[in-house]
């Protein structure tokens, strides 16, 4: 196969991988943790992924401890944990 053909094949495979629907197995495990507001005195609106509804929901974070299912905004939560119907795969957040 020519180098042009290989490049075309690589491009098609990459496109296919991006458009393939996501299964819950591709979601990071911390997305399944419950919201953990912690018991400190801060009042920080945050978002967590709710696996029962496949949605990111707001909660109030106390500012200490907690777990990794804690995002500063809804967009970050969605990008990391929500299985999109459009086939965009979630990614592991780098906190």
UniProtKB/Swiss-Prot annotation:
The signal peptide here is 1-24
| Propeptide position ranges | 92-95
Keywords of the record, alphabetical order, are: Disulfide bond, Protease inhibitor, Pyrrolidone carboxylic acid, Secreted, Serine protease inhibitor, Signal
Just give the chief location class. secreted
Superkingdom in the source lineage: Eukaryota
Q: List the disulfide bonds.
A: 31-81, 40-64, 56-77
The record's region (Responsible for the anti-cancer effect) falls at 65-67
Q: Any transmembrane segments, and where?
A: none
The protein's matches in InterPro entries, at most eight in alphabetical order, are given as: Kunitz_BPTI (IPR002223), Kunitz_BPTI_sf (IPR036880), Prtase_inh_Kunz-CS (IPR020901), TFPI/VKTCI-like (IPR050098)
Q: Name one GO molecular function term.
A: serine-type endopeptidase inhibitor activity
- Cite the position(s) of the site with description Reactive bond: 41-42
One GO cellular component term of this record is:
extracellular space
What positions does the domain BPTI/Kunitz inhibitor occupy?
A: 31-81
Point out residues bearing the modification Pyrrolidone carboxylic acid: 25
Cell location: Secreted
More about this protein: Negative results: does not inhibit chymotrypsin.
Question: Which family does the entry's similarity section mention?
Answer: Belongs to the venom Kunitz-type family.
* Task performed by this protein: Serine protease inhibitor that inhibits trypsin. Exhibits an anti-tumor effect and displays integrin inhibitory activity without being cytotoxic. Is able to dose-dependently inhibit the adhesion, migration and invasion of human glioblastoma U87 cells. Also impairs the function of alpha-v/beta-3 (ITGAV/ITGB3) and to a lesser extent, the activity of alpha-v/beta-6 (ITGAV/ITGB6), alpha-v/beta-5 (ITGAV/ITGB5), alpha-1/beta-1 (ITGA1/ITGB1) and alpha-5/beta-1 (ITGA5/ITGB1) integrins.
User: How does the record describe its quaternary structure?
Assistant: Monomer.
For this entry, the protein name equals: Kunitz-type serine protease inhibitor PIVL
Q: What is the lineage of its organism?
A: Eukaryota, Metazoa, Chordata, Craniata, Vertebrata
